């Protein structure tokens, strides 16, 4: 049985190494992608944390829908205040509560000074050195400066506008907003913080004074959407913040820098809670932050974004870090259209992190965002990372987050100068963090030094006459000798041609799936992965192996690396430009990729130092040719083989080792069946001399053994593989393995993690109106990137692998073309809203999504039966989707109608308004009041220029109420129910018009979002009940129900 050298470049070894590398990388990657690290068995393993308590809190928090505009939201808020108090009581912490402008000190531990006094402190009666007086002064200071202050914030408001909305293209008019916040802020005093109520000094907007070393804030919003229970969006974040309060109020964990837990309300409707916080005095204290969010419904919590590398190093302390800077680049480049509170704090100048759940998106904002569909492991993953991050930030008492800002922006927090960073995890265990300018230096060095080094090595090879790449034919020294081909151009262009053809076919297949069954990736991303990767692999092998079979070349691997280097260099140029100009860090993939390819290419070129000089090879080839000619002449003239036998014997006596087969061929006596040319093996030199060859004979060097008679160290003959160039027999047989290890494992880990991350984030975004082709293109690109490392070696793989992958391609292609894309585990999201004209009593239910599936869903709804379903696009609200409407069951959001009477009879009372025009001016005053709501909107058909809410807080200078282009909406959010709004509105004077000559028209709208009680919004109940099990119904706009009346002024 023949044994193969495991390091030899032969099919069996290459196939085995390929299988080991790819399985060894992708099995762990898939496990990490689809699983979450287990929570500890002991729920109190970490001092100050209680995982069981956190899980019970999550179940309590997510037992109902609690959007801002719901009564349940008030219940959750009251529950949070109660839970904070219970945690502080449990830890025996002295704390105070501040509500509005009044301060209510509530000492929660025993106030008996003597009971608190340690035994080592002398009592006042027996001490004459003043220590007792100092002791009581300390106690009084501690009583005046409690360890914790809870702010029941009922006064922070926000007033501003937004020029764009999520999913809106080309919108130029603003949406003005007035929001009254009701956040909860818990401040845990740090050991380095100032004593007393320092937040009451100075003006609210003052940024000049720094208290202590600056504070560390954790933010989570406690409101949910109206169609989701908010377990991960953002219940896990809320209970994590509660546990952090518990942790930092444990005596062993008192922070050095102050810790702030912000429970903000109103994030889902426009990040309003975070914006309102900025007008609170505690906002002056925060320097760094950790924002906790949920854009999925479980799994691992990933590091979405970070402001700089310094603050990211705090997250690196997490036991199971997870994330890549590529996700941050997605926001920076505008590919991700949704936002979190992170963007508010970053704009304020804070330095911090955005950690969020990100999959599965099919459960995001649905009724499956509950405790049942998440896990205690996911909770622990976010909680443990948050503890590690905040603990590191609160211990950093140096100048990292202090001092003048790097951007010199006036009015921002003076929290030092941060540097753009690059970060990524490896197998969810190791977290790499470095500065973007370091990556830029690597990129620039690689762009300049790598080509120079390759040219230098090539030059040295050429000087030594050993550079076989691009070598053609060389003429021997004899005047009548024919040129001898080196075969250096063989296989030079097959790699780029194959790559172009294979990539085109792969992208074409992605377009085919997008054309026929575009949503299959929604539920079957791994089927799409398998199809794309198996297609690329099998086609690439077929072309390259076929070329190698027809025209073998020992340079094929080297040329492949050269072309990869050229392509990678071009891509790296673009990545370097983005690093420098746009601060995009995701190019680290290509830096690592190109560095590995460069080293592999260097080996491919450098291994030619082991080859003979080209001139020597040509000379030996000519001698071999002459020797064969001598043998031919002897055979023709009938010369016996005595002389040849004598030479063979002499050779054996000198210790030369010969192959037995060669002896047989050399000693055979020619006869009429002997071939006319080449009496011996084609690769062996004949030892038979000829009588008539003396005039043509050249001097034979002592070292000459023929062009193919190369020997290893043991004296065994080495032959070129599979008909490749004769000189290739002297190439090292092990260098391919080093090259594979360079371009294989680490590159596959880094690229594979990013590819899996991006596809998991994108494959269920089609229902949001995102481009349907995008996830298929991402899969195709990363399939190619992940398989490029094997392509230089692919012609040496056995046929078994491409055969298997071709069968995989056929099976997955058929499945992807014909399978239904949704299931109960991967439900299609249909967006719901009901609008009611309170003047006429007409109501309309609108279901939004991809028209093909929306019509199928509506067909299941009884009240829509027999109606003509009208579908149209509305890019002002959500682009890329169809809005299909029908007349639905009347809502009962206001309980003012007796059973048996049509609810339309009570519509008039749901919303009342009065508008008064100011004479001779383009001004009007609106009085608006809605029942069972705290959210109303003024929508204008034409823009206005200014507005003012009576009784509202002073407008923050950081925001404009109305943009220069004007606004056409005013959103009004109140912290109180059934509030009457008084709003002054002014609009610009038109051309050739005088003040007072122009009016305005529009609608007064109020919103209702509470769907906790069945029957309040029966159209929504009906849609949920009768829609197919592969569908979920989620909210479209701020209100599930909009009631409106027309106004003319």
Swiss-Prot record:
Compartment(s) of residence: Vacuole membrane
Cytoplasmic side stretches: 1-11, 460-495, 548-557, 607-740, 795-801
Binding-site residues, Zn(2+) 1: 221, 233, 293
Disordered as annotated region, ranges: 114-135, 621-686
Chain positions of site Transition state stabilizer: 364
Any GO molecular function: metal ion binding
Cofactor: how bound: Binds 2 Zn(2+) ions per subunit.
Basic and acidic residues biased stretches: 622-633
Active-site residues from the entry: 267
Keyword Glycoprotein annotated: yes
Residues that coordinate or bind Zn(2+) 2: 233, 268, 365
Glycosites: 50, 157, 914
CDD domains according to UniProt: M28_Fxna_like (cd03875)
Family annotation (InterPro entries): Fxna-like_M28_dom, M28_fam, Peptidase_M28, PFF1_C, PFF1_TM
Membrane association type: Multi-pass membrane protein
UniProt xrefs under PANTHER family: METALLOPEPTIDASE M28 FAMILY MEMBER, VACUOLAR MEMBRANE PROTEASE
Cited function: May be involved in vacuolar sorting and osmoregulation.
Similarity section: Belongs to the peptidase M28 family.
Protein name: Vacuolar membrane protease
